[in-house]
Amino acid sequence: MQSWSSAPVPIVPGRGPELRLYDTADRQVRPVAPGNTATMYVCGITPYDATHLGHAATYLAFDLIHRLWLDLGHEVRYVQNVTDVDDPLFERADRDGVDWRDLAAQEVALFREDMAALRVLSPHDYVGATEAVAEIIELVEKLLASGAAYVLDGEHPDVYYRSDATLQFGYESGYDRDTMLGLFEQRGGDPGRPGKNDALDALLWRAARPGEPSWPSPFGPGRPGWHIECAAIALSRVGSGLDVQGGGSDLIFPHHEFTAAHAECVTGERRFARHYVHAGMIGWDGHKMSKSRGNLVLVSGLRAEGVNPAAVRLGLLAGHYRADRFWSQQVLDEAVGRLQRWRAATTLPAGPDAAAVVARVRQYLADDLNTPKAIAALDGWATDALDYGGHDEVAPRLVASTIDALLGVDL
């Protein structure tokens, strides 16, 4: 699947400290230590509606990781999927009277436009689930052969994963069984499905039903389940031992827990990823922004209103990536004002020495992506530059390059 074009990333002189991130599984901030090539898998959209600010905030968080790795001199192998075969997509296409493939293509195209406008660096591999069916089938075959999966008896011989197939199941979320069952039911699971060995067993392959797309397989025609898609795409593109697996905090369970379990079951490794990283939710009108609730602020809508995407990006980065937070007109207005001040300061013929502020920005971002502190440091430099001037002719350009390279904001 085609990705989007990325703007060049400036090279900033010097080097910052190694990146440290909060790991959901270990419940602590600890160093990320990739090799020459850093690897990251981030779950993509289900393309049945336009990109809202909750999506945008998630992809901006992982864009910061991408940028910090580049700043440290790493090559980056970044993989993102598109869940272009799933019930919500079929339901929306049926409601609107369109072909599900056409709807998916339309929304993926809009997503690309939004990501390019927000200056999110494109993934190395951008893969639709429909493009990875062969890899998914191969992974399901391995799980069946090992006894980690089974075929349900009855009219619809669906394939399920045994949730007890790995001893470490549950380590990523740390949730107790009751919490898991509740979230499983809320987030696409089927704990009440008759015939399953355990209520928490997860669907790997849905046997063909009338009116649904299907693909041939050794275990019968059908289509992939949700979690197995990401496991197969990640393993086939970058293998096990990812440096970072990421997404929104609403994916911790069941999606990321099962994705890791599927992969660990076939590789025999203790952890699918070295770091599990999750972004907080963005709220609007008193609730988490979500397609199902309909309380959405769309990136494309803001762009259509003439809002500068750089201000949207800066507004979302003003809060810490792990924090649940609300979007508002005030957040946008503050971002617009900050953008104007930064532009004014970085277009001066000279300014205060920039070495210290560049070092602080690197330090704060390396400390679990502390964008509020990084932005405050830049605010301080801009205020000094505008109020008192300076004699360093290189400083304004250096600060502008730092903001571009590390925060992704083009002044």
Curated annotation (Swiss-Prot):
A GO BP entry: cysteinyl-tRNA aminoacylation
Cofactor mode of binding and number, as noted: Binds 1 zinc ion per subunit.
Positions of L-cysteinyl-5'-AMP binding: C43, G44, I45, T46, T58, N81, V82, T83, W226, G248, S249, D250, I282
Protein name, per record: L-cysteine:1D-myo-inositol 2-amino-2-deoxy-alpha-D-glucopyranoside ligase
A GO CC term assigned to this protein in UniProt: cytosol
Catalytic activity reported: 1D-myo-inositol 2-amino-2-deoxy-alpha-D-glucopyranoside + L-cysteine + ATP = 1D-myo-inositol 2-(L-cysteinylamino)-2-deoxy-alpha-D-glucopyranoside + AMP + diphosphate + H(+)
Motif interval(s): 'HIGH' region: 45-55
Organism: Mycobacterium marinum (strain ATCC BAA-535 / M)
Record Pfam families: tRNA-synt_1e
Family: Belongs to the class-I aminoacyl-tRNA synthetase family. MshC subfamily.
Signal peptide location: none
E.C. no: 6.3.1.13
